[in-house]
Design a protein with these regions (language model features):
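Enriched for short, Lys/Arg-rich terminal
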Residues: 68-101
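Short, contiguous, well-ordered secondary-structure segments
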Residues: 38-42
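Generic alpha-helix structural propensity
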Residues: 31-34, 53, 69
Length: 101
């Protein structure tokens, strides 16, 4: 899956293990790197749906965003790169058609 970052700072944290460890601490950095690896290895968002980390859609004011757990209470929040986000006839998001975040 293609991953794009909202800021250069976040991209640097994701690509530099030492900076990631310094910014996030050991436990959160390990989980952050693992979740990113899961996303990189996936072809679509559906591939990570049932992996550890509880990947899930958000609602209310965060509708159109997804999250996965890091260490409590932290989570990684991301948005699909597709615009508009693919939906079915019932208005539910089609995870298998999302190929970038």
């Amino acid at each position: 899956m293609d991953i794009f970052f909202q800021s250069k700072k976040l991209e640097k944290i994701a690509s530099d293990p030492r900076k990631c460890l310094k910014e996030l601490g050991q436990t959160r950095a390990e989980l952050f790197q693992k979740r990113l690896r899961d996303l990189y290895r996936a072809d679509t968002l559906e591939d990570v749906r049932y992996l550890p980390g509880r990947y899930h859609e958000l609602s209310e004011n965060r509708k159109g965003q997804w999250a996965c757990d890091l260490d409590q209470p932290y989570r990684l929040i991301f948005e699909p790169h597709e615009d508009p986000i693919p939906t079915d006839e019932n208005g539910k998001y089609v995870w298998i058609e999302i190929k970038g975040v």
